Amino acid sequence: MTPLRLSMSAFGPYASLVEIDFSRFDSSLFLIAGPTGAGKTTIFDAMSFALFGETTSDVREAGSLRSDFATEETKSFVEFSFLLRGKEYRVRRSVPYEYVNRNGKLSRKAPEASLEIEGKTVSSSLTEVNDKIQKDLGLDSSQFRMTMMIAQGRFMDLVQAKTKDRLEIF
C-alpha cells in the first residue's frame, strides 16, 4: 500500500480541513517523526480510522475523534487515498458525534463509510467497506497497527512477539 492523500476535517486537534499529499514525496517509504504532541499519532489514527473505523489505540474510541475546536457546521470525516496493486483506492468515513439539532435536542451523527476503487464506488456500507478493505489489504486493524507504526512504548511488543505472530503480520 502506497499512501497518496489524507484529508482530515474536524478530526482530532484539527478544527477544519487538513490535507497531506504523500504523492509529492519521491519515496513510497515514509518516516513520520517529530516531538511529542506534534500530531504524528493523529495521522496514523486518521489512516486507521479511514481503513477500519478504529484508531491506533485501545484507549481512543472513534466517538472521541471529533475535534473539540470544530464548529457545529463543520463535518467530521477522514478521506484516505492509496495505491494497492496498481489500483487507486479512496475510502472516506465520517466520525460519529453528538450535536444539537434544530429542535434543540441532542442528536447523534451516525458513522458512514464509502469506498471507491479506480474512481468507481464499490460500497457505501460500513460492513462491506470494512470487509473489502481487510480482504484487499490482507491485514486486520491490529496487524495494520503493528506494521504501519510502532507506538511510543510499544516497540518491545513487536520485538517480543512470537515467531508465529510475526509471520502472520509479515
Q: Can you say where each PLM-predicted feature lies in the sequence?
A:
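Short, small/polar-rich loop/turn modules that mediate ligand/substrate recognition or access, typified
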Residues: 151
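Cytochrome P450
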Residues: 159-163
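Extreme N-terminal "head/tail" segments of very large remodeling/mechanoenzyme assemblies
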Residues: 1-131, 135, 141-143
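Conserved beta-strand/loop subsegment of P-loop NTPase cores
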Residues: 147-148
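Catalytic phosphate/metal-binding cores of nucleic-acid and nucleotide-processing enzymes, i.e., regions
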Residues: 169
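Nucleotide phosphate-binding site architecture
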Residues: 156
